[in-house]
């Protein structure tokens, strides 16, 4: 029986390309090579596609995916040249141009099956402002917030923050993930510099009420109504703010899996996670991040449509705790991708 082709797209144009490479390397090592051949394509910061490596067996420990200068010495290809009949694409891409619907639309034009969110779920979860409106509509609780726009009067935005929120607040670009461009602001004097930093990444910004809370995460897997959620895990930090470097570079966090919460609270988190996932028409996978306060209030922080996927990332570890290994999780995601593709193609008839 011939092997199936799994195409890994990694790198990308966003500030989160380093996370993408780490995730893609983990996937290439964990793939079931009795079932798959893995072909890898690097997307440069400029958006160019480069065919890099091909694996028919588990790579050696020291083998790395080609990136940056090394990859760019390879010939560039037309993006459409990644097409291969019956292949499944795993877009291991984070942030803009990766989990915002852009690459998903491109893959649908090519009529390729792909792992993860569709155009709608990717774009709606990537945009923090739009996502907040959707989650409000279905009754999933969130912390108070103020929307800010780069072309508006910044003094008026500051006044709205003073009237509606209490410091500390968190300033977040609306269309970015992995804590890139996010600042914790403890007083009014620091608000404008934080907004200026966020505007580097998006002209639309969310200013959220800070809460003294535990950070609890829940992994979701499935398509349509057939959706499963894990027992939650907890992010335990050695730093005051769980920023990009503490997440991926400095290793200043640890995770408790499963989280030490009551059965009732775990069930509430699972139900909110599934409700949020279905509200944005989730497909394949998502990681839903929550705040849980000392008095038991639960607030949805965000839904990550393509969560970090290294072998030490929360998403696969949550499923491992439920008895689904990293390698089996990848196979399940491929099967879900093929199911979604078949449904989409049938709807076009």
UniProtKB/Swiss-Prot annotation:
Q: Which domain of life is it from?
A: Bacteria
- Gene (UniProt): ddl
For this chain's UniProt record, which GO biological process terms are given? cell wall organization; peptidoglycan biosynthetic process; regulation of cell shape
Its recorded reaction(s) are: 2 D-alanine + ATP = D-alanyl-D-alanine + ADP + phosphate + H(+)
**Residue ranges annotated for the ATP-grasp domain, each copy included:** 132-335
Q: Which residues bind ATP?
A: 162-217
Disulfide pattern: none
Q: Which sites bind Mg(2+) 1?
A: 289, 302
Matching NCBIfam families: D_ala_D_alaTIGR, PRK01966.1-4, PRK01966.1-5
Tell me the organism's taxonomic lineage.
Bacteria, Bacillati, Bacillota, Bacilli, Lactobacillales
The record's listing under InterPro entries reads:
ATP-grasp, ATP_grasp_subdomain_1, D-Ala_lig_Van_CS, D_ala_D_ala, Dala_Dala_lig_C, Dala_Dala_lig_N, PreATP-grasp_dom_sf
E.C. number(s) listed in UniProt: 6.3.2.4
Q: Where in the cell is it found?
A: Cytoplasm
Q: What is its main location?
A: cytoplasm
Which biological pathway?
Cell wall biogenesis; peptidoglycan biosynthesis
Q: What does this protein do?
A: Cell wall formation.
Q: Which residues form the signal peptide?
A: none
Q: Does the keyword ATP-binding apply?
A: yes
Its needed co-factors are: Mg(2+); Mn(2+)
Family, per the entry? Belongs to the D-alanine--D-alanine ligase family.
Q: Which GO terms describe its molecular function?
A: ATP binding; D-alanine-D-alanine ligase activity; metal ion binding
Its recorded name reads D-alanine--D-alanine ligase
Q: Does the keyword Ligase apply?
A: yes
Top EC class for this record: ligase
């Amino acid at each position: 029986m011939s092997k199936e082709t799994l195409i890994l797209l990694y790198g990308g144009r966003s500030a989160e390309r380093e996370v993408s490479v780490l995730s893609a390397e983990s996937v290439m090592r964990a793939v079931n090579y009795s079932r798959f051949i893995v072909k890898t394509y690097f997307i440069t910061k400029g958006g160019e596609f480069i065919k890099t490596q091909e694996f028919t067996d588990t790579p050696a420990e020291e083998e790395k995916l080609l990136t940056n200068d090394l990859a760019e010495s390879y010939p560039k290809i037309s993006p459409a040249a990644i097409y291969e009949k019956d292949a499944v694409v795993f877009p291991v891409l984070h942030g803009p141009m990766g989990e915002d619907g852009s690459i998903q639309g491109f893959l649908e034009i090519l009529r390729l099956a792909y792992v993860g969110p569709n155009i709608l779920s990717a774009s709606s979860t990537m945009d923090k402002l739009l996502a907040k409106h959707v989650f409000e509509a279905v009754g999933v609780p969130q912390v108070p917030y103020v929307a800010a726009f780069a072309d508006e009067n910044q003094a008026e935005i500051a006044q709205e923050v003073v009237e509606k929120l209490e410091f500390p607040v968190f300033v977040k670009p609306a269309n970015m993930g992995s804590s890139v461009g996010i600042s914790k602001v403890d007083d009014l004097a620091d608000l404008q510099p934080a907004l200026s930093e966020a505007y580097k990444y998006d002209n639309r910004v969310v200013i959220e009420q800070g809460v003294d809370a535990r950070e609890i995460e829940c992994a979701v897997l499935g398509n349509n109504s057939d959706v499963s959620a894990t027992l939650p895990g907890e992010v335990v930090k050695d730093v005051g703010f769980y920023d990009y470097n503490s997440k991926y570079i400095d290793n200043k966090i640890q995770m408790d899996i499963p989280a030490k919460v009551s059965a009732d609270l775990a069930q509430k988190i699972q139900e909110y996670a599934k409700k949020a996932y279905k509200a944005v028409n989730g497909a394949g996978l998502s990681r839903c991040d929550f705040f849980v306060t000392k008095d038991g209030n639960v607030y949805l922080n965000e839904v990550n449509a393509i969560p970090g996927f290294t072998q030490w990332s929360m998403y696969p570890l949550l499923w491992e705790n439920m008895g689904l290994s990293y390698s089996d999780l990848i196979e399940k995601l491929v099967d879900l991708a093929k199911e979604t593709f078949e449904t989409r193609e049938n709807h076009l008839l």
